[in-house]
Amino acid sequence: MSYRIRLFAKDCVACNACYEACIDQNDIDVLKGDEPFRTGLEYEPRSMVKAATSACLHCSQAACIEVCPHGCLYRDEVTGFVVYDDTVCIGCGECAKVCPVDAIHFRADGRIGKCDGCNERVKNAMLPACVQCCPTGCLRLEEV
């Protein structure tokens, strides 16, 4: 069984609850410059705001997995999410270059950071933190 987190942007009210949940769940140190992996906001001309996501789409043909020279990125056999082992990441950035949605970031220590779909939560029959806290339901965990 494979999953994905889907964003229904029209339902987003830009409350940033998902952003905060991602920071909390992943112990992201924004003061050091580390970035959350979840939805953020983009601003369009004339002050229009739209929801945008920097979260991994967990592509079925994930180029990031293929280009990683140390096997840092791999697909979880249970959830189907593209996950990583940051202890083997050398920070070369090859994965980020091929990501079609700019979902791969590098932490202040130079190692990879990306949405892993809250993989361990999903394995334990829980929703990803961003999905669980979303007050409008614009983020949903779906089977694919």
Predicted segments, located by residue:
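Non-ligating segments of multi-cofactor redox enzymes
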Residues: 1-144
